[in-house]
């Protein structure tokens, strides 16, 4: 009786110990799985209205686009320590009324920018504007950015004169001398013309970002929708051509439709 009881008492702690070990392994597995999920990064994000208060959020992205005019060199160093690639927004084709330099260059505006009341198209052919953009891009380069996200080359679509084409080209070729990534946002009319003239686009860009390939924006109602098949097919063909030229291709879509997101 005692031996039997002792036998049971001997086995019970061993069984409990094994159970606790299994439970511990299970908990560790769940913790590691949750940690892996927590630190799984998104590929790409564009955050033009953000400032340094969003640094923690940016750590969940492999590559981000920010307006580095509102960040310090130290901010960008912290993002690099996290392994995040940082591109800076740079508007070369329009002038925004909230910039501190607006009053200096407002006289160079050449037309209203539809749907964007705070912006006006700017004369990129003007030497003063080209010099200013050169200085600004130098300052951003010195902050340690990995590349430039160039906006509003579409000024050539708005005003397709030779001087505008040459002005954009001069600005882009100067930025390319930094040896950093140069991503053109949109600008298909200008890029297509450059390719037609020179046969390649690697002298002005390393990548392209295209908005609204699959989605669309109704500015009058402030709602999102699906892009027309005609426009979608046009942009897909354009982007395929860019990719064939060896540049990186990024998409920026505006939608809350899960089915459209999956596309």
Predicted regions and their residues:
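Hydrophobic alpha-helical membrane-insertion segments, chiefly the h-region
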Residues: 22-31
């Amino acid at each position: 009786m005692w031996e039997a009881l002792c036998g049971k008492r001997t086995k019970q702690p061993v069984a409990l110990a094994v159970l606790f070990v299994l439970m511990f392994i299970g908990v560790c597995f769940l913790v590691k799985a949750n940690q892996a999920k927590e630190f799984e990064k998104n590929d790409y994000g564009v955050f033009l209205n953000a400032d340094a208060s969003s640094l923690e959020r940016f750590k969940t992205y492999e590559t981000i686009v920010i307006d580095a005019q509102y960040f310090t060199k130290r901010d960008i160093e912290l993002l690099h320590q996290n392994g995040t690639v940082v591109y800076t927004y740079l508007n070369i084709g329009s002038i925004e009324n909230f910039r501190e330099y607006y009053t200096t260059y407002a006289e160079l505006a050449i037309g209203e920018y539809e749907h964007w009341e705070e912006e006006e198209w700017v004369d990129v052919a003007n030497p003063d504007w080209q010099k200013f953009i050169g200085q600004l891009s130098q300052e951003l380069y010195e902050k340690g950015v990995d590349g430039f996200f160039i906006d509003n080359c579409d000024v050539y679509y708005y005003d397709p004169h030779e001087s505008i084409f040459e002005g954009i080209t001069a600005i882009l070729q100067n930025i390319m001398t930094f040896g950093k990534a140069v991503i053109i946002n949109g600008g298909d009319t200008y890029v297509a013309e450059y390719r037609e003239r020179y046969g390649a686009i690697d002298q002005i860009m390393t990548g392209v970002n295209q908005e609204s390939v699959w989605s669309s924006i109704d500015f009058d109602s402030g709602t999102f929708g699906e892009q027309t098949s005609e426009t979608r097919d046009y942009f897909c063909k354009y982007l395929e051509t860019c990719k064939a030229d060896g540049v990186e291709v990024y998409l920026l879509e505006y939608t809350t439709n899960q089915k459209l997101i999956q596309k």
